[in-house]
């Protein structure tokens, strides 16, 4: 199987499984606990039927929309994905180029493989930054200040990851960042020689936005769950979010809102948008799917907030269903990068 033979998301997933070592593939592919929520995110779209009205003159469809104060050519954008250079050497650079090519937003993770400044210099397309609030407030402040200097268009504060989800696939494979080549994992890496070649002949893996502040994750191997539990602030509260909103002073969303009550409170602290998200089912297994929660939240907040659905999106009809339930936009974080990302978009 090659890129030219990939026609849907499942095709790309099969190709990724073929090309990536098991620890890398299962990190990006897996979810929390029994992965019920992860699978439900997509199943909820499939449980919703479309009833088309015919003869409505759609010869010149207009897919344009606006979110984070940014005009986009389509109602989808790339949700933030960590450590993309583990999946392709160009990592975040390829994602940013693909988003710019198709007139949509690129979202950068705090745990990106390339820095805020590198991506800003590479792409003139719209960009938002996904912020994790760290225990060390100087890290959080530094990230916000750098995004301001780099002229990012918006920011989203991830609020559903103050402690790590129980990702059992990662326990089994021993996934760490950077990857550790142990006796247990050696065979898996050895069976993917092209990945190994790319890993050792391209830019050294690093958490580019954090490397000057935190050694673990770049120079010292650590599990992602260990990093989250050690570095992210479990005491984060509404006051902390409001502080970041005021410091950023621009278009901003809370990412990880699932309840009507929290959506209403996001308005009160100055958010311009919310991302209805359960972190792709990677945090709390058993939570509701974003698609099933969209209408209740949108009915509650009206036009006071942009409402963005994150997670489970696999096809254009999924985007259509989300838009019909009043979202401003749809995002997904499991897309590939480079040519694969362009074909998926």
Name these PLM-found stretches:
Residues 21, 78, 99, 157, ...:
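Conserved, mostly hydrophobic/aromatic
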Residues 76-79, 106-108, 127-131, 155, ...:
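Hydrophobic faces of well-ordered beta-strands that scaffold small-molecule active sites
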Residues 145-155, 162-288, 293-307, 324-325:
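Alpha/beta enzyme core
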Residues 117-124, 267:
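Acidic (Asp/Glu)-rich catalytic clusters
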